[in-house]
Amino acid sequence: IDLLIKDIPHTLPASEEYLLSGMGEFTDFDSVFDALSDAELKFEPVLENGEKKELTHATYSAFMRSPNADVRLMAHKNMHKKFGEFNLTLTKNYLNRLKYSNYVSKTYKYANNFVRALEGEEVTEKVYNTLIGAVHSHFADFYRFAELKRQKLNLEKMRVCDFYANSFTEKAKTITYEEAQQIVKEALKCLGNDYQKLLERAFAERWIDVFPTENKSSGAYSYSTGVSHPYVMLNFAGTTEDASTLAHELGHAMHSHYSETTQPEPKQQYVIFVAEVASTVNEMLLARYKLKMAKTKIEKQAIAESLLQNFYATVFRQTMFAEFEKQINQKIADSEALAPEDLNAAYEQLLKQYFGSKVELHEYAKFEWSRIPHFYRPFYVYKYATGFVSAIAISQKIVDDQTG
């Protein structure tokens, strides 16, 4: 009822709603990006051990974890160089997406797209700004982490492509999908028998599309249909991090299943702001399980490093993305004319600010913004960061058998 009351000032006459509803077919900027990024862009191969290896969205993460610094740099450059070749196309598509979102927001009598997105999640601007401010206040800690990482990797200079490299060779092993299933089940036993049975169902009934295939969307997602069980899409490549991805996406799927089977239909939907908590709690429980099962000091160090890398990827980077998104959306709301160079410069400035003067950027790093699919879901990425921080606290309470 409260939400309905809040929506009253933003409700349009039926005739206007009808006109807006018909625009979706002509404003599908997301699918244009997906077609270009996932199907049409072909990246230069990466030279590894004297052999040319295919670079795709699915293999990119493995290259970023390579122990060979030259391989990491080549993969990072080749990926972003190709996106740079389509900089104008991608800029126009993204800006048109933002212009459309801002137009719809103003039509619904919101000040801009930022306000509409946050109100839809029942989140205040203070939460968003506090996240950015908190990360800014800990830049010095991140710079110290970067320096420690450089020393462990024995690099003369830390580069933007080196943060996913593993300092401990024991961590670089590969796992099968069946092994990942078993690890996830063991790690999530603390969630109870019902949860375990549901995991077994998901595996046995093949809720999960596991492996990468040609023209398949990159990344990992969970989909709720409302009429059947949820579906999960992975691009499993056999890294230990893929087990974390499996746990994460199953967190979304279980959340959807429980909501749809226990709540009346009007209450089944949940805001994304809390969705990322359910998924990331699973990741944290998996990490705690792996720490508990580690037998040697170096194993524990490797797992701790993995947690720090997850924090880097989920809190640090996603907050940087969130700040970029806010900057560009504000310029759109202010009707500023923007060119590719403006977006590239804004992103490069944030890279320099977040990574500091001692981390080396290459000439194609500034194009990274244009390959982030979540930017086509306005003001989504900050929820990864808030979800991660919340999940750390919640997972600790679960392990300690506390309530709250």
Set out the residue ranges of the language-model regions.
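Long, K/E/R/D-enriched contiguous segments that form extended
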Residues: 152-190, 196-197, 255, 308-314, ...
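A well-structured
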Residues: 1-170
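Catalytic zinc-binding patch centered on the HExxH motif and its immediate surroundings
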Residues: 173-175, 208-228
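Active-site recognition of the HExxH zinc-binding catalytic motif
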Residues: 109, 237-259, 276-279, 284, ...
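Post-HExxH zinc-binding segment in Zn-dependent metallohydrolases
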Residues: 269-299, 307-309, 313, 387
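Conserved helix-loop functional segments at active or binding sites
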Residues: 190-197, 223, 252, 256-264, ...
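Short pre-active-site segment immediately N-terminal to the catalytic Zn-binding motif
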Residues: 172-177, 183, 190, 225-247
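C-terminal, non-catalytic "cap/extension" segments appended to globular domains
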Residues: 2-10, 28, 122, 151, ...
